[in-house]
Amino acid sequence: GSEMCIRDSCTIDPNVGVVTVPDERLKLLGDFYHSKKVTPAVIEFVDIAGLVKGASKGEGLGNQFLANIREVDAIVHVVRCFEDPNVIHVDGSIDPIRDIETINLELVFSDLEILERRIAKVTKTARMDKEAAKELDFLQKIKAHLEDGKLAITMELETEDEEAWMGTYNLLTWKPVIYAANVAEDELADDGASNPHVLSLIHISEPTR
């Protein structure tokens, strides 16, 4: 079993689990082609402890946790939507929108540090290299976007070069996000439809791109 802790930023390593993706077509194809072995697709989950305000500056184990997810393809943000006086919340109340904004801000701060390092490196060659100069302009555009409180994933990329560059930066705010509402067991039957916290979560979860 995995180690559990109800406190944010507990001193534990991430839990990593690999789950196979069910697909009925695999058996049919395996039988049709008389395959000796059928290997299903898998998804690797990296479960980190909760982040808190200041995580990007090292509060709790924030920097370590952020580093653990920088290489992932997508982020699943589990958001607390249940009331229980016996389960503490680091901010003292249940507010999923506030929690999401807190995490997003920490991801933005972390990405800005990545961009600053890249900008410093590219600046050294930008005067003599046209491609480097173009990338520098793009980096400044991303930086301004993030400093405006927006996620990188909401940016409109204009060229193939921009798409290629963005793919190399591993920005946390460029990754697709799934918000998973953590509800009480008695709310599972109606998918939390009567829970105002879930409804507010649905409201802000419009696709970004």
Task: Locate each region found by the language model.
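Short, small-residue-biased leader/transition segments that mark boundaries at the very start
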Residues: 1-6, 206-208
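C-terminal-of-GTPase-core extension/linker across diverse P-loop GTPases
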Residues: 121-201, 205, 209
